[in-house]
């Protein structure tokens, strides 16, 4: 038997080591250093949104009812943006606008700024959480990299776009119908659907949905052998003890369908990662361009010919007229403080009139 004589080699832990040990301890819900950012920000963002949609009116900022208390439902309630006159103020509760008055702060739109900033940092915290856990268990950080796509879209739409405009007023309010209205605004004032970055974003998101459906169906088709049971859903009730997934079989199937197929699993799954993330990033870049009022495609020759020839019209010229109508109606409706009055002769009409 060996007896060790002397002092223990274990050194007392410092504050940082103690915190690191507690934060990264194996537990049912991992906390981690990223949790110090994620959990408070997510809690405040969600709590602010629930508070705003339940109790807070948009009468003082938009002239609208926007809460359950006023009769809205889940689709029409929203936490609306601050008034246009407040420009890019951070709208701190203790700031010069609200001066510590919580009711006034809510009336001015302070909850929108509260939810937007805490939401942005909450998303960043969630990305860091994926990175931290991946590092702990020895995975590559591709999940965290993929999540930069949603973060880029959120930050560009809710923060960068209004920063390029005259104020937070022009950001989307946090609500379903409010987001739909913002999309109509984007189309009318920026011709967003004809923007090449929007086109790349649509291709990325819908392409990713197609890839996901194809991949799921292919794996489901090849993961188990068919049995003899007359059950339509026998694939979900396998009698095998082990999976029989075959990349070779899947490759042969798609080679016959398209003439080409992915050669290996790594390239296949990288492509499924690349398509949606690139689409989201392209959309985010496009929104940053809109913040600077960069224009989409303009087919001026068609517009000139349509103006000269009442019988000439294309889908493009019809959409341009539609955009003019959206602008003429939404500008006066959404910005009553501007007292916009358009004479009838400038309102859009069809080319044949």
UniProtKB/Swiss-Prot annotation:
Q: Which cysteine pairs are joined by S-S bonds? A: none
The name of this protein is Photosystem II D2 protein
Q: How does it sit in the membrane?
A: Multi-pass membrane protein
By sequence similarity, the record places it as follows:
Belongs to the reaction center PufL/M/PsbA/D family.
Q: Other comments?
A: 2 of the reaction center chlorophylls (ChlD1 and ChlD2) are entirely coordinated by water.
Task: Give this protein's Gene Ontology molecular function annotations.
Answer: chlorophyll binding; electron transporter, transferring electrons within the cyclic electron transport pathway of photosynthesis activity; iron ion binding; oxygen evolving activity
What is the cofactor note?
Answer: The D1/D2 heterodimer binds P680, chlorophylls that are the primary electron donor of PSII, and subsequent electron acceptors. It shares a non-heme iron and each subunit binds pheophytin, quinone, additional chlorophylls, carotenoids and lipids. There is also a Cl(-1) ion associated with D1 and D2, which is required for oxygen evolution. The PSII complex binds additional chlorophylls, carotenoids and specific lipids.
Which residues take part in binding pheophytin a?
Answer: 130, 143
Instruction: Identify the domain of life.
Output: Eukaryota
Sites of the modification Phosphothreonine?
Answer: 2
Q: What role does it play?
A: Photosystem II (PSII) is a light-driven water:plastoquinone oxidoreductase that uses light energy to abstract electrons from H(2)O, generating O(2) and a proton gradient subsequently used for ATP formation. It consists of a core antenna complex that captures photons, and an electron transfer chain that converts photonic excitation into a charge separation. The D1/D2 (PsbA/PsbD) reaction center heterodimer binds P680, the primary electron donor of PSII as well as several subsequent electron acceptors. D2 is needed for assembly of a stable PSII complex.
Gene assigned in the entry: psbD
Q: Which residues carry this modification: N-acetylthreonine?
A: 2
Q: What PANTHER family is this protein classified in?
A: PHOTOSYSTEM II D2 PROTEIN, PHOTOSYSTEM II PROTEIN D1
Q: What does the record give as EC number?
A: 1.10.3.9
């Amino acid at each position: 038997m060996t007896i060790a004589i002397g002092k223990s080699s274990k050194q007392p832990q410092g504050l940082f080591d103690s915190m690191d040990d507690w934060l990264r301890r194996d537990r049912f819900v991992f906390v981690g250093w990223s949790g110090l950012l994620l959990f408070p920000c997510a809690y405040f963002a969600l709590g602010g949104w629930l508070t705003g949609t339940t109790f807070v009116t948009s009468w003082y900022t938009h002239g609208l009812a926007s809460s359950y208390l006023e009769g809205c439902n889940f689709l029409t309630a929203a936490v609306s943006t601050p008034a246009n006159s407040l420009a890019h103020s951070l709208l701190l509760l203790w700031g010069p606008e609200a001066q510590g008055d919580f009711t006034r702060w809510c009336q001015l739109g302070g909850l929108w700024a509260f939810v937007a900033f805490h939401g942005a940092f909450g998303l960043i915290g969630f990305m860091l959480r994926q990175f931290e856990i991946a590092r702990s268990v020895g995975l590559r950080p591709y999940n965290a990299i993929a999540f930069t796509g949603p973060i880029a879209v959120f930050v560009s739409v809710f923060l960068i776009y209004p920063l390029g405009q005259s104020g937070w007023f022009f950001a989307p309010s946090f609500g379903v119908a409010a987001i739909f209205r913002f999309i109509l605004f984007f189309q009318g004032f920026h011709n967003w659907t004809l923007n090449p970055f929007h086109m790349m974003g649509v291709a990325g998101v819908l392409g990713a949905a197609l890839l996901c459906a194809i991949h799921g169906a292919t794996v489901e088709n090849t993961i188990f052998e068919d049995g003899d049971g007359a059950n339509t859903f026998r694939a979900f009730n396998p009698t095998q003890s082990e999976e029989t997934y075959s990349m070779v079989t899947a490759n042969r199937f798609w080679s016959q369908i398209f003439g080409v197929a992915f050669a290996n699993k790594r390239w296949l799954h990288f492509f499924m990662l690349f398509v949606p993330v690139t689409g989201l990033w392209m959309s985010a870049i496009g929104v940053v361009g809109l913040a600077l009022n960069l224009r989409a495609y303009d087919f001026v020759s068609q517009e000139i010919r349509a103006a000269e020839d009442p019988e000439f019209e294309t889908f493009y010229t019809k959409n341009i007229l539609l955009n003019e109508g959206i602008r003429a109606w939404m500008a006066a409706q959404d910005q009553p403080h501007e007292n916009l009055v358009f004479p009838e002769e400038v309102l859009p009409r069809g080319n044949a009139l």
